[in-house]
Amino acid sequence: MWNNLKTTILLAAMTGGLLVIGEYWAGQRGMMFALVLAAVMNLGSYFFSDKIALKMSGAKPIARQENPRLYQIVERLAAKAGIPVPKIYYIPTDSPNAFATGRNPSHASVAVTGGILDICDDEEIEGVLAHELGHVKNRDILISAVVATLAGAITLIARMVYWGELFGGFGGSRSNNRRGGGMFSALAMMIVAPLAAMLIQLAISRSREYEADATGARITGNPQGLARALDKIDKWSKRIPMQASPSMAHMYICQPLTTGGVFSSLFSTHPPMRKRIERLIGREQF
């Protein structure tokens, strides 16, 4: 319920932001265009954000005969979690990672990379998949997928505004009267938009990871399995960085973008792996 409310607030805020931008650059005509754009984006985010996320990650559906072991694990965990069995996808990369997406538990998908299947044993794979099913059970997946879509859209709109202003604005009188200020505002938006998208990701992601870890550990009854998997994923993902869209970084079980530097932990979409492992090791009794 709370996640559905947060999703509604997020979509409403995006609509309001687009209306303000449209009115500033092209008056009433800009507001009408922004309203149509917001309606398309809101509907698209709700119904197609999971498909967009799977497409952006390069995930492919995997049939039961291709990996019966994976299907058995997912089906067993879904039964324990009390949720429908999600669709299963495979991401062809050696970097170990995984994510879940969808509108609700009845329309959910989980995706795992080849790296996860290569480096993890069955208990560790169970831990990873239980974590992802934890996101499904906790209903994190809709807001997570919507944020991924909107983060990309925010950056795209900022670029459109910038290039539109650079090559003569949007044709409105306001744009013509404010050419200097409009160009400065468009440039500022180009800089601020990615930061705003990142802050949105940070606002909804860190606590969710702790909660999904705890839920996954309860599903399996084996927090050590997930703790070992996280340790392996952390080490191997540094050796084999994953090529992932920044707008999707918050969706993965492990931060796919290696930033490094003094601000890396501050602006990471995930809590430090060490802290996640320590919390799990302390959760051995259920």
Which functions belong to the PLM regions below?
Residues 19-29:
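Short, hydrophobic transmembrane alpha-helix segments
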Residues 1-10, 28, 43-184, 195-286:
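Polar-ligand-bearing catalytic/cofactor-coordination segments
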Residues 186, 190-191:
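Hydrophobic alpha-helical transmembrane segments of integral membrane proteins
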Residues 30-40:
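Hydrophobic core segments of alpha-helical transmembrane domains in multi-pass membrane proteins
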